[in-house]
């Protein structure tokens, strides 16, 4: 899930815009 991805520094760094869009 995006939530799990955003919790992962490496994954989040690759999807910063997506993670910032997820509240």
Swiss-Prot record:
Region (Lacks the Ser-Xaa-Pro motif that is crucial for potent interaction with nAChR) location: 7-9
The protein in question is named Alpha-conotoxin-like RgIB
| Family indicated by similarity | Belongs to the conotoxin A superfamily.
Q: Which GO terms describe its cellular component?
A: extracellular region; host cell postsynaptic membrane
Which Gene Ontology terms cover its molecular function? acetylcholine receptor inhibitor activity; ion channel regulator activity; toxin activity
Per its database record, what is this protein's job? Alpha-conotoxins act on postsynaptic membranes, they bind to the nicotinic acetylcholine receptors (nAChR) and thus inhibit them. Is a specific blocker of the alpha-3-beta-4/CHRNA3-CHRNB4 image nAChR and may also block alpha-3-beta-4-alpha-5 (CHRNA3-CHRNB4-CHRNA5) channels. Has possibly a distinct nAChR binding mode from other alpha-conotoxins, due to a different three residue motif (lacks the Ser-Xaa-Pro motif). In vivo, causes hyperactivity and behavioral disorders in mice following intracranial injection.
- Record keywords: Ion transport included? no
Indicate whether Secreted appears among the record's keywords.
yes
Tissue specificity comment: Expressed by venom duct.
* Domain remark in the UniProt entry: The cysteine framework is I (CC-C-C). Alpha4/7 pattern.
- For this chain, the annotated S-S bridges are 5-11, 6-19
Q: Where in the cell is it found?
A: Secreted
Keywords from the named record = Acetylcholine receptor inhibiting toxin, Disulfide bond, Ion channel impairing toxin, Neurotoxin, Postsynaptic neurotoxin, Secreted, Toxin
**Coiled-coil residues:** none
């Amino acid at each position: 899930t995006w939530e799990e991805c955003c919790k992962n520094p490496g994954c989040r760094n690759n999807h910063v815009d997506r993670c910032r869009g997820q509240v």
